[in-house]
Amino acid sequence: MADEDINPVVLLADPKVNHRVWAACLKWTPVVKKQRVPSHHKHKSHVKPRRLTSLKVTVGSTNSRGKISLLTGTGILTRPERNHYFSLALAFCSWVRNGYGVFRYSDKELLFLASINGQPAVMADLSGNDADVAQKVSLFLAMNEEPPEKWQVVSSLEHPDNWESIITRLSSADLRRCKLTVGNRSKFTLP
């Protein structure tokens, strides 16, 4: 696995529920159907890899032609704990179909979340300082065609809301959709 695939996530503790943690900065990629590799063609490494804990979720949507598109969000936990993990990007998509928002999670750090057709945007779910996020918002707007109903701007860069405003609107069904699967990753080694 390439180094760029190792992306630690930003973890935010839910202020109202113990052991519920919201994960941001997942890497979102479209799901591509893979061909099966016969077992005698698989390469087995002789180096014992360090085990990391991964977070993963796959979501799908159907377009007007009936075609299903799937996205997978993945991230790496550097220090796993006994918590239940949920995707903040999926929570954002639960109430914003085509839009974006900038949210504050610390004194100097912001989150940029965006939704296209009710799914997380591949180039969103990112964090950084004010300048980084401004650049990411500009890139998102330049690379994505504006929908007919215009982009819904939930929280602007000039006046970012607190990230907790996202989770206050969730129903129990939305919460189930946001749940992340926790697993071990042993396919790569760390330096």
What are these regions (language model features)?
Residues 1-178:
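Cytosolic/nucleoplasmic/matrix-facing N-terminal domains/tails
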Residues 176-191:
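C-terminal single-pass membrane-anchor helix
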